[in-house]
Every structure is written in structure tokens, then in C-alpha cells.
Amino acid sequence: MAVSSEQIKDLRERTGAGMMDCKKALEEKGGDIEKAVTYLREKGLAKAAKRAGRETGEGKVIAYVHGTGKTGVLVELNCETDFVANNEAFEALGKEIALQITAMSPLYVSEESIPKSEIENEMSVQKALLEKEGKKADQIEKILPGKMKKYYEDICLIHQKSIRDNSKTINDLLQEAIAKFGENITVGRFSRFQVGGN
């Protein structure tokens, strides 16, 4: 099926994908824009997975102070090139992540940044609670991974649901940005400050 330049332009504006990628997606999906968007997102996420291991030596430190001035966040958002680091959409992503940190108070970026002793301690606490409920060892082994997943969702930034769209996690937002910018993007670290807090 032949696709029009208007369709290609519309798809480019909606996805940020290249012209040839848009043309191919529209041809593959018979000119259906919605299906082409889905196709490009899936393709983009596949590309994002390939980029995940690449080094992120550029980026920005994004500052956010909540309206009352009593809570603030500094977040290090990393990327591969200064071109992306200076992009308004990259900075908007950083502000979105900083707002998330302000609202949800995560303790760590991901489970990889949690000290091993803290994970072991949490596992022990969860096992003890399950034993106290009368659960058997084989039941505990099945339940414990779900308890730990919930624990990670509570304290790890990338596993938290976005405060703006709870159908997505912060990791989903990062993966979408990787697909959009065509390079790896990571959260290096963050600090949350609160008046009267420790």
C-alpha cells in the first residue's frame, strides 16, 4: 500500500522516529497510524534494550524545589552525548524524575544500589512475618519473591509507578526516552532534601 507524505509527517510528529522508519511502519501496517505507532514503540524498545549497556558519560544534574520551598531534589541524569543532554525533552525527563523523588521519597535508584545486608535483613523480616502467620517453608518460598518485589517498588526509584501515569514505572519512562533519543539514559544518583528532615 502506498502511504502519503502527510501520513509519514503525522507519524513522525507523534513518535519522533526517522522518516524512513515511519514509512516502513506505515507500509507494514497498511497505512494504519495507530498500529504504526505501536510497531515503532515495540521496535524502539527493542533498540533501547540494545543500548542499555552503552556508557553514559554525559548528562545533567537537575534541581527541583517544591513550591513550598521545604523539599528539594538533585538528580543526576546521564546520557551518551552532550547533544541529548542539552535537549529540552531530556531536561523535562529529569524534572519529571525529580518530581517523582520529591513526592515518593525513594531511597535507592535500583535494587543494585541497595546494600546486600539490607536486602538480607528485609528477607529475614519477611520470612519471620510469614512464619508468624503459620506459612510452611514451601509456601514461604513462593510468597517471598512477591514480598521482595513490593519492597523494591517502595524504595527503588526505577520500580516506582509514575505519579503522573501509574500505568508506567520510572524505568518505562527511561526506556521510552532511550527509544526516542537513540542512546542510553540512566539515573546516576539523587539526593532528596527536606526542611527538618535527616
UniProtKB/Swiss-Prot annotation:
Pfam (any one): EF_TS
Which GO CC annotations does the UniProt entry carry? cytoplasm
Q: What does this protein do?
A: Associates with the EF-Tu.GDP complex and induces the exchange of GDP to GTP. It remains bound to the aminoacyl-tRNA.EF-Tu.GTP complex up to the GTP hydrolysis stage on the ribosome.
Outline the segment boundaries, as ranges, of region: Involved in Mg(2+) ion dislocation from EF-Tu.
81-84
Compartments where found:
Cytoplasm
PANTHER family on file: ELONGATION FACTOR TS (PTHR11741), ELONGATION FACTOR TS, MITOCHONDRIAL (PTHR11741:SF0)
Give the superkingdom in one word.
Bacteria
Query: What's a Gene Ontology MF term here?
Result: translation elongation factor activity
- Which keywords has UniProt assigned to this entry? Cytoplasm, Elongation factor, Protein biosynthesis
Q: What family, per the record?
A: Belongs to the EF-Ts family.
User: What is the protein name stated in its UniProt record?
Assistant: Elongation factor Ts
Matching InterPro entries, A to Z?
EF-Ts_dimer_sf, Transl_elong_EFTs/EF1B, Transl_elong_EFTs/EF1B_dimer, Transl_elong_Ts_CS, UBA-like_sf
